[in-house]
Amino acid sequence: MTRLLTHPDIAWREDGTPFATAFGDVYFSAQDGLAETRAVFFKGCGLPEAWAGRAQFTVAETGFGTGLNFLALWQLWREHRPHPAARLSFVSFEGYPLRAEDAARAFAAWPELSPLADQLLARWPGPVRGVRHLAFEADGIELILHLGDIAQTLPASGFRADAWFLDGFSPAKNAGMWAGDIFPLIAARSAPGARAATFTVAGDVRRGLAEAGFEVRKAEGHGRKRQRLEAVYPDADEPVIPLPRRVAILGAGIAGATIASGLKLAGMEAVVFDPAPEPARGASGNALALMMPRLDAGDTAEARLLIDAYLAARDFYLGRPGAELTDVRQMPRNETEEKRFGKLLADPPFPLEDLEALSGGGILHKRALILRPRQMVLSLLDGVEVRAGAMPDVDLGARSVNGEVFDAIVLASGMGMGQLLPALELAGRQGQVEHLSGAVQAPPSALASGTYAIALGNERLWGATFEPAGEGVSAAVSEAARAENLEGVEALSPWWVREAQGGAAVSRASVRATTPDRLPLIGAAPDAGAIAALWDGKAERASSPVLPGVYVAGGFGSRGFTWAPWAAAIIAAKLCNGPPPADLNSLRAVDPARQILRRLRKTGRL
């Protein structure tokens, strides 16, 4: 199995309908696919009436195809959004993603959708396995697209849908999408009273839904199809959990800023606390930052997690103030790394639009980003209340900050998290960079080989060191680190040596919070004492007690700008009772409780 998914071969019929040659079926009805979506799925799931008065509504779909159902639903949501802060999540599964040009050709049949189609096509995901997250903030709608074989991606997902669009190709031509073991998975991911709709009335589908617990009935079909199916999952009396209204966020760096921005869009009042006199004074305060992927040669769960986070971050930053596209030339540091690059390029995790081999054994990372951190952080905090300049007095048990009670608290303060949750394993690593402003303007560019060097306009930045920081969260510049950075630049190119030596560079050091396994801590804050009390030598992470209303987003190391948007989306999903933009393997990998459970397994003690 290759790391990249296969694009489907499309044949275009005379009436403009796309036809999947591998499956021998059309992507939508020749009798107006948009009308079919409305008649089969909207009517079958009771939309838009079903989301009236809801703060969060989730629609799931089997078979993303051209994306027509998503566009039509987006249009309906814009017309019937319950209130300005309401959120609509669309979770879809696709094993053979279309090329953007094929999707554009399909959308051309409906000019009324073009304003939305243009937005989707501008961010169209490539054929990269994993979970893509596209948030269209102005309309409060998000697309969470699980790319890969549904037999693997659906069991690995964790969410509850209020409505299901069952829209794979015909069961006779795409049996895997309608396999018997799919229906129990759909039921397990259905909220009480969830409705499902599909164009087919095949007996296996009717029986599969019924055996999974749905009440199934036939309804009048669309076009040439005389009938379709509607199904309802049993309702249940569940307590309505009110969404948090006021959330305290500790930390005004990129982690806190992305979280605050997302919660504000969800209609919550976010208050950010930071002991520094102003935002972006810590590890998020360098003049420039480089965001490029960390790619592993193997197709592991961790490798996919890193790719998911990087692509989510790139999509999040593009178009915002302080973000510039760039190519990064990365050269191997040694023979071992050169072999790793070769293995990586033999089965690349990205298409050629993003990744290319360089002579000399290097890699060209296309469409990476140069960021202006302070500008980005301040733009995200626009309209958010920030209380800076004093160390806040925090009581996690009472969910209070300086005596003021909040509905939830999010810890996004880097090394400061360890003072409030001492059971977390965090180690400080000091990083020093050198920055100068010169007279010569340069287009966005970057080199990397252990050290990285960034040019943007008249600014140059290079570094960074990565050394133990000792106790505390303070950092100090040093001549030794400055010399190390200059030595790193000398290995990059003669041009950069001249740039580095041609002006008065200013050194800046900051402390970054890291974890032993190099993965971040994202999710509910674990209750270490309660976990230890329940420990029986085989406790499962899913049952680990947590501190009510307390969440963690940190341990990002030197990749804070990569992890932050992905982490913010996960925290927002938890607070809004929405679907996470990640699979269960990824969520387990970053669950803060993993550290406590690992210690208990190893030593039997906290």
From Swiss-Prot:
Its main location: cytoplasm. Transmembrane segments: none annotated. The keyword Transferase applies. In the N-terminal section; belongs to the methyltransferase superfamily. tRNA (mnm(5)s(2)U34)-methyltransferase family. In the C-terminal section; belongs to the DAO family. Pfam families: DAO (PF01266), Methyltransf_30 (PF05430). Residues 1-234 are annotated as: tRNA (mnm(5)s(2)U34)-methyltransferase. Residues 250-606 are annotated as: FAD-dependent cmnm(5)s(2)U34 oxidoreductase. Catalyzes the last two steps in the biosynthesis of 5-methylaminomethyl-2-thiouridine (mnm(5)s(2)U) at the wobble position (U34) in tRNA. Catalyzes the FAD-dependent demodification of cmnm(5)s(2)U34 to nm(5)s(2)U34, followed by the transfer of a methyl group from S-adenosyl-L-methionine to nm(5)s(2)U34, to form mnm(5)s(2)U34. GO terms for molecular function: flavin adenine dinucleotide binding; oxidoreductase activity, acting on the CH-NH group of donors; tRNA (5-methylaminomethyl-2-thiouridylate)(34)-methyltransferase activity. It catalyses: 5-aminomethyl-2-thiouridine(34) in tRNA + S-adenosyl-L-methionine = 5-methylaminomethyl-2-thiouridine(34) in tRNA + S-adenosyl-L-homocysteine + H(+). Keywords: Cytoplasm, FAD, Flavoprotein, Methyltransferase, Multifunctional enzyme, Oxidoreductase, S-adenosyl-L-methionine, Transferase, tRNA processing. Its cofactor is FAD. Its EC number is 2.1.1.61, 1.5.-.-. It comes from Hyphomonas neptunium (strain ATCC 15444). This is tRNA 5-methylaminomethyl-2-thiouridine biosynthesis bifunctional protein MnmC. It is found in: Cytoplasm. The lineage of its organism: Bacteria, Pseudomonadati, Pseudomonadota, Alphaproteobacteria, Hyphomonadales. PANTHER family: SARCOSINE DEHYDROGENASE-RELATED, TRNA 5-METHYLAMINOMETHYL-2-THIOURIDINE BIOSYNTHESIS BIFUNCTIONAL PROTEIN MNMC. GO terms for cellular component: cytoplasm. One of its GO terms (biological process) is methylation.
